[in-house]
Amino acid sequence: MAPAEKAFVLRKKMDTAIEDRPGQTLTDDHQVKVAIKATGICGSDVHYWKEGGIGDFILKKPMILGHESAGVVVEVGKGVSSLKPGDPVAVEPGCVCRLCDYCRSGRYNLCPHMEFAATPPYDGTLRTYYITTEDFCTKLPKQISVEEGALFEPMSVAVHAMTRGNLKCGSRVLVMGCGTVGLLMMAVAKAYGAIDIVAVDASPSRVEFAQKYVGAKPFTPIAAKENESLPDYAQRYKQAIIEKYGEFDFAVDATGVGICIHTAVLALKRGGTFVQAGNGKPVIDFPINHIINYEINVLGSFRYAHGCYKQSLFLVSNGLVDVKPLITHRFAFKDALKAYETVASGEEGVLKVIIGGPDA
């Protein structure tokens, strides 16, 4: 019998505990067991903790949190050929069927049978060991730490958004939101040849970080007038941006906030591309006539698909994107709740918070 493990468990809304969980054993020849050494905290993790659910995904029983993880392989199935015990890996936190049309076309993020870590009812990665399949692990070279490997998950979100929008070299790019994902979108856009990147966020420290991190040009959101309609506000907001920086070829929203989305669409050139990557309200006002008349390409971007982790590995290992500056806080596993409280505080200067493994 496998030894017991430690796990950071969400028992119910705002109720967490470090628990002993039964040890796990491999059940398939192509599985690997990974000792988790570093886990980043995502906004969705905090939302589950604070609200007990996201949309249709409602916590109905205790769930292990975490999905941005990396660690070291400790055991492999007899069918595993590309990994061995001792290999450091970034863990892709979804399990798919591999049989549906979406999986077979490489768009496995759309698999209707997806089992995604720390999405009810499936347990996450904040535990001693996580069992997954060989092909959902990305081996890390010596120059990349497991902390950097943990950031491959949000970076793959950024890679997928740029890929969905078919970002062209020489594009002028507008990014709404300077959280970790928004900053990584800027970094990936720069690596892909964007010539101008404008960063928009209400947080002065985050906009300043974007300037230093990728050379982004800053823009601070303008305030709405009293009783001003959202379309009128968006028109003023857009005008303020383009008077300073001109129109854009490509815009991406990482906030999910209605005014940011509306404004970003309006700030595009005719024939421009808008990618929505941030979750928000289920229904918002959208400038549909503008989209039609300007032939704006509007795309949704959900998580990541085939090749995104490998592309993240390429960008980081070749020095095209540096994820290390994004890590602002580190906590031991025993202090996982403090880590969540730090992210939830919304304090200036907090970007990516990393929790070490139980035996790190």
Curated annotation (Swiss-Prot):
PROSITE patterns to which the protein is assigned, alphabetical: ADH_ZINC
Residues bound to substrate: 48, 153, 303-304
Binding of Zn(2+), residues: 42, 67-68
Gene Ontology biological process terms from the UniProt entry: sorbitol catabolic process
The entry's keywords: Metal-binding, NAD, Oxidoreductase, Zinc
Gene Ontology cellular-component annotations: cytosol
Catalytic activity: keto-D-fructose + NADH + H(+) = D-sorbitol + NAD(+)
Protein residues bound to NAD(+): 201, 206, 277-279, 301-303
EC number: 1.1.1.-
Names of required cofactors: Zn(2+)
Coiled-coil parts of chain: none
Record's keyword annotation contains Zinc-finger: no
Gene3D superfamilies: Medium-chain alcohol dehydrogenases, catalytic domain, NAD(P)-binding Rossmann-like Domain
Annotated S-S bridges: none
Subunit-level organization: Homotetramer.
Similarity comment: family membership: Belongs to the zinc-containing alcohol dehydrogenase family.
Role: Polyol dehydrogenase that catalyzes the reversible NAD(+)-dependent oxidation of various sugar alcohols. Is active with D-sorbitol (D-glucitol) as substrate, leading to the C2-oxidized product D-fructose. Suppresses growth arrest induced by a p53 tumor mutant in fission yeast.
Protein name in UniProt: Sorbitol dehydrogenase
Chain's gene name: tms1
